[in-house]
Structures are given as structure tokens and as C-alpha cells.
């Protein structure tokens, strides 16, 4: 489930990215972290997105976002790229990478574990489902910090 501030953040960040010749392709606000983490995913439409693109976006938006006071409490800003990050965030990612190996990291232990590895089966409103050696595991979305694509299929 997306944080209620994400649409406002996207509306604010999109023109800034565009002014730098970049595209904003996603935003996630992880409020279960302390301090919360705002991650903006960008891409360069005409070449590979590099660290310099992420740095330019970070420099351009950081102070403006603070001045706009969209997020009233302290937070960390992360700028990344789908080419740099292997994290699955949106429905499109979870559909595209069905059957791929993923690592799921939870904010607190679930069934005694904070780290789950398996093949991605699906995601719905309540959970992410992975296959672990023929057994399906259901991990509540409310506990998930990250779902990261792993090497190999």
C-alpha cells in the first residue's frame, strides 16, 4: 500500500526531474524506518542512468522538498534508478518478475525470520507470495521493507 503523501511527492518531483532531462519513474515512502526513507526512482530517457544523474536529482530536489514542507518530520532522501536498483516496488514489477528469485526483507521478524529468499509467485493487497523449495510462503505486506531481485532465475 502506498503512503498517502506519495501522489503529492510525485506531482512535486516530476517537473524537477524533467528540468534535468530525467524521468521520475517511481516514489516510495518507507515510514517503517527510523528516520523514514523517501526513495525516488529516476531514469535518463536517452542513455543509461548514472550516479551523476542521481546526484543531480538529489541536489535539485532536496532543499526544494524541505522548503515545500510536504514531509513535516525528518526523513532520508534516496535517489536511485531502476538500472541501479533491483528493488521491486509496483504491480508492473511484480508481474514482470514472476518466477524470478527474490529476497524479501521484513521490518520485524515474521515466523522467526527477517529475510526470506524464494521464487516470486505474486503479490496482492495483503501479502507477497514466494515459493521456497516447493512450499509457498506468504509474507504480510505491512511487514515488508524491501523485495529485491536476486541474480539468476
From Swiss-Prot:
The keyword Cytoplasm applies. GO terms for cellular component: cytosol. Coiled coil: none annotated. Keywords: Cytoplasm, Ribosome biogenesis. Disulfide bonds: none annotated. It holds the Pfam family RimP_N. It is found in: Cytoplasm. GO terms for biological process: ribosomal small subunit assembly; translation. It comes from the Bacteria. Required for maturation of 30S ribosomal subunits. Belongs to the RimP family. HAMAP family: RimP (MF_01077). This is Ribosome maturation factor RimP. The gene is rimP.
Amino acid at each position: 500500500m502506498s503512503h498517502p503523501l506519495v501522489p503529492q511527492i510525485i506531482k512535486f518531483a516530476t517537473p524537477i526531474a524533467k528540468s534535468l532531462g530525467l524521468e521520475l519513474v517511481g516514489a516510495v515512502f518507507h515510514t517503517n524506518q527510523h528516520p523514514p526513507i523517501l526513495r525516488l526512482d529516476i531514469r535518463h530517457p536517452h542513455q543509461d542512468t548514472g550516479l551523476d544523474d542521481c546526484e543531480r536529482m538529489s541536489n535539485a530536489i532536496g532543499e526544494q522538498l524541505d522548503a515545500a514542507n510536504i514531509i513535516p518530520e525528518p526523513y532520508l532522501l534516496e535517489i536511485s534508478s531502476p538500472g541501479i536498483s533491483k528493488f521491486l516496488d509496483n504491480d508492473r514489477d511484480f508481474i514482470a518478475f514472476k518466477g524470478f528469485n527474490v529476497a524479501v526483507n521484513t521490518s520485524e521478524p515474521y515466523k522467526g525470520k527477517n529475510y526470506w529468499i524464494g521464487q516470486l509467485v505474486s503479490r496482492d493487497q495483503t501479502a507477497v507470495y514466494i515459493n521456497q523449495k516447493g512450499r509457498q510462503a506468504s509474507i504480510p505486506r505491512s511487514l515488508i521493507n524491501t523485495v529485491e531481485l536476486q541474480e539468476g532465475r
